[in-house]
Structure formats: structure tokens, C-alpha cells
Regions:
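Internal catalytic-core helix/loop-beta-alpha segment
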Residues: 73, 83, 101
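Long, compositionally biased stretches
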Residues: 2-68, 95-159
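Compact, glycine-rich, soluble single-domain proteins
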Residues: 64-65, 72-77
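Short active-site loop/helix that positions an aromatic residue
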Residues: 77-89
Length: 159
């Protein structure tokens, strides 16, 4: 099996079931067209989008519904065509498509979610886009408050 190098996970197998393709790349990362969507039970519901060509490029994301349960996903006809979605129906988030908010962790510890430009993935063919909304309803810096780590999962100091 082919392996890819990553900054945070070392070498990992290239699992085609986790592969997400961005036909046009991501804004500012147009050459990055293939990512692994890595989920781990310890960090659920967090999703890591790891580039398969650039080891140091890994985006953190959360399902939009985890950030804003009332989020209204809009997908244009052009975006539907790129994703390979039916042009006549509007898929709600988390059914035909997965909608993810990219997460930013600032040096000062602030954490925010980009609700203005969600990553939208067609679950059937694993094609994805970053859909930019210009309607002003959502921010690219929606503040997040991280829950405290559960007491039973905190690592104990060595004795």
C-alpha cells in the first residue's frame, strides 16, 4: 500500500476511502487537490484534512452542524456541477453532502471556525469545494469555545 508523509501523523497509508478531491484546489492552495479526511475517536468530531502531496499542510475542520446547528448551506448551480450533485434539489448539510468549517487556532489561543467558506464534500464521489458565501450572514472568524478535557482522559504525570 502507498504511504504518505505527514507532519502530525508520520507516515500513514493512503486509504482511497478517505480521499477527498478538490478539482480546483482550495483558495490560496489551488495546486493542492487531494486530501485525506482523517477522523480519530479521541478527537471526534474533529476532522483533519491532510494534503497527500504536502506533508506540512493539514487543515482542522468540524462538521458545520457542530458549530452552528441552524447553519443554512447554500450551493450554487456551478458548485453543484463541480460536485456532481443533482441540479434540481437542494441537499441539506450532512445527507448527500458533508459540510465542514475550517478551524483556525491563533497563537494567542483564540480558536475560530470559518462559516463564511465551508468545505462541501459530495459523500458519493468524494469531490469537494470550498464554497464562499458573500451574503454577510456568516463570518470567517466565528469564535469557538473549546470544552475542557474530561478528567478521565487527562494524562497523568510520570512517577
Amino acid at each position: 500500500m502507498v504511504e504518505i508523509k505527514t507532519k502530525y501523523f508520520g507516515s500513514i497509508p493512503l486509504d482511497s476511502g478517505l480521499l477527498v478531491e478538490f478539482p480546483s484546489g482550495l483558495p490560496a492552495f489551488e495546486r493542492e487537490q487531494a486530501f485525506l479526511a482523517i477522523e480519530h475517536p479521541r478527537t471526534a468530531p474533529l476532522v483533519m484534512l491532510q494534503s497527500i502531496t504536502t506533508p506540512d499542510l493539514c487543515f482542522l475542520a468540524l462538521p458545520i452542524s457542530e458549530v452552528d446547528p441552524d447553519y443554512q448551506l447554500l450551493i450554487s448551480a456551478e458548485e453543484r456541477a463541480v460536485l456532481g450533485l443533482d441540479q434540481t434539489t437542494d441537499p441539506p448539510a450532512n445527507t448527500d453532502v458533508a459540510a465542514l468549517a475550517l478551524i483556525a487556532v491563533r497563537q494567542d489561543g483564540r480558536v475560530s471556525a470559518n462559516l463564511m467558506s465551508p468545505v462541501v464534500v459530495n459523500r458519493a464521489n468524494r469531490r469537494a469545494i470550498q464554497s464562499v458565501r458573500w451574503d454577510g450572514l456568516y463570518s470567517h472568524e466565528h469564535p469557538l469555545r473549546l470544552p475542557p478535557a474530561p478528567a478521565d482522559t487527562q494524562e497523568q504525570p510520570c512517577s
